[in-house]
């Protein structure tokens, strides 16, 4: 079979195999201003880029105001974090400071408390790919809430509507 190209309604080409009617999957582009940041109310602003509801994976960009501390949580799956700006660390590991350009891998089962130093010059900007859920813990280590792909998408859509008048932001959603 040979590759041919046809036009999609958007005018962008999509590749097809000759003799088939099914198109190859195409890449989905989201520019930084396609999805709004929402104020989560605790010194964080979230931009949910992608969720795979079947696999339980959520991809987001988060900005943290100086002095922000996020509730202690345990991950049920692996997390990848890439710091774009600013600096942050886990209270449990104060010497391991994430700065612009740093990559962090968190294995499933890791427990920590994210903290952004109050003396940061501006917001800290981090890109996360999270597999599974965050089990949010109280001071005794008991689970008080769960954050996962489903809840992140639901809350993000709600906050987009409340804060920006956008009820259906163009989050890339798989596995729905």
Regions found by a protein language model. Name each.
Residues 41-48, 56-74, 107-111:
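Conserved short histidine dyad/triad with adjacent acidic residue
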Residues 57, 79, 123:
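Conserved catalytic motifs of the protein kinase core domain
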Residues 1-56, 142-176:
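A short, N-terminal "cap"/entry segment at the start of jelly-roll beta-barrel domains
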Residues 95-100, 108-139:
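Ligand-binding loop in jelly-roll beta-barrel domains
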Residues 63-65, 74-90, 129-131:
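Short, conserved beta-strand element in jelly-roll/cupin
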Residues 53, 80, 89-111:
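Short acidic-glycine-tyrosine-enriched beta hairpin
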Residues 63, 75-77, 95-103, 142-144:
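"Short basic amphipathic alpha-helical interaction patches in structured regions
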Residues 70-73, 91-92, 115:
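A generic structural signal for short coil/turn motifs at secondary-structure boundaries
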């Amino acid at each position: 079979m040979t590759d041919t190209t046809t036009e999609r309604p958007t005018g962008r080409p999509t590749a097809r195999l000759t003799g088939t009617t099914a198109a190859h999957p195409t890449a989905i582009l989201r520019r930084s201003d396609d999805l709004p940041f929402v104020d989560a109310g605790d010194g964080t602003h979230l931009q949910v880029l992608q969720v795979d509801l079947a696999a339980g994976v959520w991809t987001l960009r988060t900005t943290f105001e100086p002095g922000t501390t996020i509730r202690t949580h345990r991950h049920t799956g692996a997390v990848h974090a890439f710091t774009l700006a600013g600096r942050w660390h886990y209270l449990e590991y104060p010497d391991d400071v994430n700065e612009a350009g740093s990559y962090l891998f968190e294995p499933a089962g890791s427990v920590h408390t994210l903290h952004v130093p109050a003396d940061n010059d501006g917001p800290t900007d981090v890109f996360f790919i999270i597999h599974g859920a965050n089990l949010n813990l109280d001071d005794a280590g008991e689970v008080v809430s769960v954050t996962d792909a489903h809840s992140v998408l639901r809350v993000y859509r709600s906050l987009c509507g409340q804060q920006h008048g956008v009820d259906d932001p163009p989050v890339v959603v798989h596995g729905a």
